[in-house]
Amino acid sequence: MASLNKLSSNDIGNIDRQIAKLKQGQILTESEIKSLCIKAKEILSDEPNIIQVRAPLTICGDIHGQFHDLIELFQIGGNLPDTNYLFLGDYVDRGSQSVETFSLMLSLKVRYKDRIVLLRGNHENREINKVYGFYDECFRKYGNEIVWKQFTEVFGYLPLSAIVEQQIFCAHGGLSPAMESVDQIKQLNRVQDIPHEGLMCDLLWSDPEETKNGWGISPRGAGWTWGCDITEKFLHSNKLKQIARAHQLVMEGIQKVHNQKTITIFSAPNYCYRCGNQACIVEVDEQLRMNQTQFEPAPRENEPHTTRRVPDYFL
């Protein structure tokens, strides 16, 4: 019997047309999005909370609705299915094309489900994206909240973490005082809005602290900060070598702290069209060597392009 997730030739043709349509700058219809979300939920519901990922692959950080820069990212990193991708979350909000961005991400997931992993970020949550742009954008482009509701249902099915070759732990935010073993992530019910505290919250909200050891109160109001000693203990007890995460704007697109064992990757250049930062993607080869590629914003019209420094902590 054929797998429920196996695409028919007709499905493949439809998805390929949708991908081409999106790349041409058109949005999908409501009915196309409804069908896409149904297929995506079927695929994602088969994935565990922690995805075991093989190298080679390319790890990418926040995208935040910067659709032109996502297209540029694929130009630089290589198109699917020739390149395997792991995205660390935050596909929506802030940027002006979150609808196109997440439509493309889901279309690629449905088309090449074994070639792309989409983790959940803290913005893949109703409470956040109703305020920071995604809800308003959906309403503006479709005239109702139906599409927003369909997309936000999918968010609950996105996995929470990944481990590359049993050595690199990946999550959107980071560590939690509630987690000694990564196996605890397996027990979570992820199909829900992100709680305000606890392990699931912390995985998507926490940040590394460069200068202090131990756990600290996060200035974000959710999650924690964690020091180098916490990283060392976590890696040792779970037989891991590194942590890769996103969640924080870093001006060069990548930042390594905690003796280079905690890596922050940010893939939205000139964040919010004003921050002046570079973006970065990180290729991991079969020997787990990392090759970072930094890039500037894709050329586009009618968007401000100014440079200014912003605080380290940006929701």
UniProtKB/Swiss-Prot annotation:
Residues 298-315 have a biased composition (Basic and acidic residues). Binds 2 manganese ions per subunit. GO terms for biological process: mitotic cell cycle. The active site is at residue 123. Pfam families: Metallophos. InterPro entries: Calcineurin-like_PHP_ApaH, Metallo-depent_PP-like, PPA2-like, Ser/Thr-sp_prot-phosphatase. One of its GO terms (molecular function) is metal ion binding. Keywords: Hydrolase, Manganese, Metal-binding, Methylation, Protein phosphatase. It is an enzyme of class 3 (hydrolase). GO terms for cellular component: cytosol; nucleus. Its EC number is 3.1.3.16. This is Serine/threonine-protein phosphatase PP2A catalytic subunit 3.
